[in-house]
Amino acid sequence: MERVKQRIIETIIQINRTHTLPAYGLLLVGPAGTGKSQIAYAVARILKLPWTTLDMSSINDTEQLTGSSRIYANAKPGIIMEAFSVAGESSLVFIINELDKATNGKGNGNPADVLLTLLDNLGFTDNYMECMVPTVGVYPIATANDKAQISAPLMSRFAVIELPDYTAEEKKVIFSKFALPKVLKRMSLKEEECVV
């Protein structure tokens, strides 16, 4: 985990020194439960930028991302435009969870293609709004369980940081220091009333 921390610290230092975002985002790859999303949120807090989250495992159609044309009765802006709206500015950390699920579009088009336009820093156009949002201030941080499922063009937009799974001993420490106290408090139990 020290190597992971070092890579992230190097990126943050680079951003703070140059006052510009790198041309690539961060891709945190590792097994479920290794804290990838929490690390992404921590980086956003350290950079003092607003953040928004996009969960690719729930995206079935590109129109969910890009919005639908106003010619349709049920037309609406896409999730990406809504995220910019909620953030209130175009300089933000865009946290893309489950990036490895982006290529599994079951509907109209490939969601990964839409992400490429967002990650190119050339601007993003929503089909409903029909206007381009500048993306120069967008810093993407993505998470994935299996980088083999991510296309080469998408991978080229990220610096990859691999997070190893926790050892059995580390899992015991995490459980006893963090999870167990929360469970005991929720159940109004004392530690001596519980056998672990």
Describe the residue ranges of each PLM region.
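Helical "lid/switch" subdomain of P-loop NTPase nucleotide-binding domains
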Residues: K76-P77, L92, E98, G107, ...
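Conserved nucleotide-sensing/catalytic segment adjacent to the nucleotide-binding pocket
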Residues: Y72-N104
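Conserved C-terminal "switch" segment of AAA+ ATPases
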Residues: G88, D146-S156, V160-V196
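AAA+/P-loop NTPase substrate/partner-engagement loops
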Residues: I46-K76, A83, E170-K171
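Conserved catalytic/switch belt of AAA+ P-loop NTPases
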Residues: I95-P134
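Walker A/P-loop
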Residues: L21-M56, S85, A152
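Pre-Walker A (pre-P-loop) alpha-helix and adjacent loop at the N terminus of AAA/AAA+ ATPase modules
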Residues: M1-V29, L180-P181
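AAA+/SF3 P-loop NTPase mechanochemical coupling elements
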Residues: A87-I95, D126-A144, E193
